[in-house]
C-alpha cells in the first residue's frame, strides 16, 4: 500500500493541469456552480458549529460536523437546541426532485438545503469534496464562497456486489457502502444466490444456506446502515438458472432426467429448477416471503439470465408434458408460466420485480425479448453489444430499464492488460477507465426515447473477486466515471476535467485504507 501511495503522489505531481481549487475534487461534477464575490468563511475552534436540525436530520448534521473536523483538525460540534450556528441545514420544499440540494458558502457560513434528507446527504458529500480539493484554503481553516445548485440526471446510480461467488462479511459490505456514498450512489444490489453459494438464511428451508451466509438480522443491519447513508439495498435471488446451490440442498427440484445426478456447489453448472415441479414454486415462494420483509426497497431482483433451457426443460419429460398441455412449441416459452407464478409471490409481498434483460439471441443481431416480460418488470441490460436493442424494445413494450452494459459497466472485467493475472482464462475483454467514462446511459437518443431509463449500474461479478480489497480495486476509479454518467448532465461532462478531479479522490480513498487501481496508462509520457 505504501509503495502504491507514493506512486500515486508522484503521478499526481506530473499532472500539470491540476489546479488546487475548490472544484478540483468534485466527483461527480455538479450540474450548476456559481462563484459569488466575497470573503472566505473561517472555521474557528470553539465557535464553528452545526445548527441543531430536526431529529430526522441529526445523522446528516453529525456527518457534516465530522467532515469539517477531520479535514481541518478544528473540532466542530452540534449547537444546543435553539441556538444559532454558522452551519445550517434544512428541507426546502421548493426544490424539485428527490435529490435536489443547494449548497451555499459565504463569509457568514454554510447553508445546505435539500428537497429531502437524501438530497441533504448528497450535498454533505459535495461539501467534503470541496474541502478535499481546495487544500490550501482547507489547511488555513477557511472555505471560499461558492453556490452549488445540483440534482442528478438519473434517479438510479447503482453498484452490485456478488457475495454468492465469494462471501463478504457484514463489515466489508458496510465498508463498501461507505465508499459508494461518497460519490452519490444510491442503490446497492446484493447478488445473494448462485451456483457457488446461497448466502441468506431461510428459516422455512434451512438446508439452503451455505456455510458462510448472512443471518436475517445481519441483512437487516446492512439495510439499516445503508439507509442512514440514503442507499437502497436490493436483494437478488437468481432463478431459474444459476440454481446449483438450491439443487444441492433440494435435489428433488431438478428436472426429471437429472434427479439422480449429484450436484456439487461451486462445480456443477447449467442446472435449473424444474418448471413443471410444484415443489419448485413452493420453495421459491417461501424464500420470497422471507426475503421481502428484510429489505425496505420496493424491488426484488429475480435474475432470469443465462437459463440453460436446452439442457434442462427441453429434455425433461415433465416439462415436455407441461409444454404439450399449454400448446407451446419451444421450451423457452415455459419462462412465461414460471415467472407468472413466481412474480405473484413478489406482488403479494408488495414488491416490484427486476430481471436481467434477455433477448432471442445472445449476440447481435437480436430482434425481440426471450419471452414476453410482464408489464410491471423493470429490466437491466447487460449483454455486450445488445444494449441499443434492449433500449428500443423496453421503450416499445413500456418497461423501465437500468443500464449495466457489459462493455462499459462490468467492473469484474480487467481495467488494463495483465490486470487479472491469476484469473485470465475467460478471455474477459478489457474495460478501461476512459471507455467506462464514454457511457451515455441515454445512448444519444432523443429525450422521449430515453425517458424510461432509470439510471446505471456497475456490476462486480465475483468469480475473481475474493475479498473487499479486490472489490474496491476493481471498482475505483471506474466507479467515479459511472457515477458521473448517472449524475452529471452530458453538457457538463468532460474527460480532461474528470482526470484532474479523479486524482484527489483516489488519494483520499487510499488514505482511508481503500484499495484502488492507479490508472498510469492515461498519463502521457514526457
Model-assigned labels for residue ranges:
Residues 19-152, 353-364, 373, 504-526:
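Acidic, contiguous N-terminal accessory segments
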Residues 95-301, 315, 320-321, 341, ...:
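Feature activates predominantly on carbohydrate-active enzymes
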Residues 358, 367-526:
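Flexible, acidic glycine-rich loops studded with aromatic residues
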Residues 1-25:
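Bacterial Sec-dependent N-terminal signal peptides
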Residues 167-169, 195-199, 240-246, 301, ...:
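Flexible loop/turn segments at secondary-structure boundaries
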Residues 261-264, 268-378, 382-398:
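Active-site neighborhood of glycoside hydrolase catalytic domains
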